[in-house]
Design a protein with these regions (language model features):
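Extracytoplasmic cell-surface/polysaccharide-interacting catalytic and binding patches
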Residues: 1-184
Length: 184
C-alpha cells in the first residue's frame, strides 16, 4: 500500500452509525449513503449488513498485529509475515478504516468474510448497484497487482456517487483511476 498517512495525521472523521443492527459507523456522508443503499437492497429482498466501518488506531493496530502473528505461527519469518499480512490487512497507518470510508459489507444470509461471498445474490447486487450509492469494490480480484491486496468481495469504499460511477465505468482500481486522473 502506498497510501500511508504520517503517524501525526490521524484522521478525525465526523462519524454516524450506518447500521443500527451492528452499530458500525462510517463517515457521516458515507453512513447516509450506506443507509440508502441498504434500503434499496432491502427492496430487492437483500439484507445488507455492515460488519465493519470506522476503526480507531488501537483497533487497526490490533487487526494488523493479529494478521502478522497468524503468518508467524504458520512458519513465516518476521519479515515475510509482515509482507504477507500487508496483503490482507493494511498497516494501521494505511488502513481506510481510519477515514470512515472503508466498509465491510456482507448479507444476513452470508456472514462469512471469504471469497465465497462473491457467489451470493448480495454481492451481485452490490456489483450492479453500489456505485449508484457512491461505493466501489475496493480490492477487485482482477486488479490485485495494482492494489497490492488480495480480493475481498466484502470490502467496499465510499468515494461519492460521481466518482464511483466513473471508477466502475473505467474498470480500474482506485489506485489506477487516481493515477490516470493525475496525468490529465
Amino acid at each position: 500500500q502506498t497510501c500511508a498517512l504520517p503517524i501525526s495525521e490521524e484522521p478525525t472523521p465526523e462519524l454516524a452509525v450506518a447500521d443500527d443492527a451492528t452499530g458500525a459507523s462510517l463517515e457521516a456522508e458515507a453512513a447516509a449513503a450506506y443507509r440508502e443503499m441498504a434500503e434499496a437492497a432491502r427492496q430487492d429482498e437483500i439484507e445488507l449488513v455492515l460488519t465493519a466501518g470506522y476503526q480507531d488506531a488501537a483497533a487497526r493496530q490490533g487487526a494488523y498485529e493479529a494478521a502478522v502473528q497468524s503468518y508467524r505461527e504458520s512458519g513465516c519469518s518476521e519479515e515475510e509475515a509482515a509482507a504477507r499480512a500487508a496483503t490482507v490487512q493494511p498497516a494501521p497507518e494505511a488502513s481506510e478504516y481510519a477515514t470512515g470510508y472503508g466498509a465491510d459489507i456482507l448479507a444476513a444470509d452470508s456472514m462469512e468474510k471469504d471469497t465465497g461471498f462473491a457467489d451470493t445474490r448480495a454481492y451481485e447486487w452490490l456489483e450492479a448497484y453500489a456505485a449508484e450509492h457512491g461505493f466501489i469494490l475496493r480490492w477487485p480480484q482482477e486488479r490485485q497487482a495494482a492494489t497490492g491486496m488480495v480480493f475481498e468481495p466484502w470490502h467496499w469504499r465510499y468515494v461519492g456517487r460521481d466518482n464511483a460511477l466513473a471508477i466502475r465505468a473505467s474498470g480500474l482500481s482506485l489506485e489506477e483511476y487516481l493515477a490516470l486522473e493525475q496525468t490529465k
